[in-house]
Amino acid sequence: NLWQFEMLIMKIALTSGFMFYSSYGCYCGWGGHGRPKDASDRCCFVHDCCYGKVTTCNPKFGVVVCGGDDPCKKQICECDRVAATCFRDNKYWFYGAKXCQEESDPC
């Protein structure tokens, strides 16, 4: 769920996802459209695409146990882990959620 994702970001990237990425660029936060503004925004784009491929459970709500046998929950954990690692590995610039009218990139 989103709270677990926040905790994972804090553990891996040593920063708050809610504070820094909840309205960053074209894809961090709710929804998403246009072209990612930078590498950090692309982390959110890839995360959105990853969640979009998870069809048998809802990745945003409910408790996810990453070590379990549920393949859907394992995929959610992997989506979140990849995004948190991506945030850690890319520079944060504050790009507000504006000028995102371009055609969206395909997943």
Curated annotation (Swiss-Prot):
Expressed by the venom gland. One of its GO terms (biological process) is negative regulation of T cell proliferation. PROSITE patterns: PA2_ASP, PA2_HIS. Ca(2+) binds at residues 27, 29, 31, 48. Keywords: Calcium, Disulfide bond, Hemostasis impairing toxin, Hydrolase, Lipid degradation, Lipid metabolism, Metal-binding, Platelet aggregation inhibiting toxin, Secreted, Toxin. The keyword Calcium applies. Optimum pH is 5.5-8.5. Its cofactor is Ca(2+). It catalyses: a 1,2-diacyl-sn-glycero-3-phosphocholine + H2O = a 1-acyl-sn-glycero-3-phosphocholine + a fatty acid + H(+). GO terms for molecular function: calcium ion binding; calcium-dependent phospholipase A2 activity; phospholipid binding; toxin activity. Its main location: secreted. It holds the Pfam family Phospholip_A2_1. Its EC number is 3.1.1.4. It is found in: Secreted. Monomer. Belongs to the phospholipase A2 family. Group II subfamily. D49 sub-subfamily. Snake venom phospholipase A2 (PLA2) that induces significant edematogenic activity. Shows mild cytotoxicity on Trypanosoma cruzi and Leishmania infantum. Also inhibits ADP- and collagen-induced platelet aggregation. Does not show myotoxic activity. This is Acidic phospholipase A2 braziliase-I.
